[in-house]
């Protein structure tokens, strides 16, 4: 967890560098370079894992459709087969979260590798970023369909909601990374 926090901090500093009057890139290099490169070295060994690796049994979509369930919705104790009921602020630990976790992993790996590339200009990092990006968005067997029709589903109420876009907030790091890599 410490390494992830350090890498996230480093990425934030890189992105804020254009707004700061001092050389934040030099500061990041001096303080965090070793940790960033260590994490990126581990990420180079990791194969892409997309949502197609995790079957969402309750989804009406197929393996290419991102699926998540509303956090605060629970089985109704008075009717276990009926629609779920809301428990504000109480996350249901039985909810399907594998697609969210895969996306968080993807964005973390891409961010880490991008940070390492910005520090070293070593093209291995860019090549590995692109391997993950192709797996998520291009490869016919592993891609994620570019819609969120089944995100934030609630059993017995809806197969998905527009608020599901919040589950993809992590893709901002991927987009920023690709922008920084000028791809």
Each predicted region: which residue ranges?
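Bacterial N-terminal signal peptides
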Residues: 7-16
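Positively charged n-region of N-terminal signal peptides that target proteins for export
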Residues: 1-4
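Short amphipathic alpha-helical "recognition" segments used for binding
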Residues: 6-7, 73
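Extracellular glycan-targeting catalytic surfaces
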Residues: 19-183
């Amino acid at each position: 967890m410490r390494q992830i926090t350090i890498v996230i901090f480093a990425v934030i500093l890189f992105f804020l560098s254009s707004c700061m009057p001092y050389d934040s890139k030099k500061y990041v290099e001096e303080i965090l370079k070793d940790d960033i490169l260590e994490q990126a070295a581990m990420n180079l060994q990791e194969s892409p894992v997309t949502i197609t690796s995790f079957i969402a049994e309750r989804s009406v979509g197929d393996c290419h459709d991102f699926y998540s369930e509303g956090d605060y919705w629970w089985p109704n104790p008075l009717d276990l087969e009926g629609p779920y009921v809301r428990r504000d602020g109480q996350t249901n630990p039985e909810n399907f979260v594998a697609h969210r976790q895969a996306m968080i992993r993807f964005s973390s790996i891409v961010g880490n590798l991008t940070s390492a590339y910005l520090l070293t200009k070593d093209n291995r990092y860019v090549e590995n970023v692109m391997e993950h990006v192709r797996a998520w968005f291009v490869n016919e067997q592993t891609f994620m369909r570019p819609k969120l029709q089944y995100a934030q589903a609630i059993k017995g109420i809806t197969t998905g909601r527009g608020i599901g876009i919040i589950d993809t907030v992590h893709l901002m790091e991927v987009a920023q990374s690709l922008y920084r890599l000028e791809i």
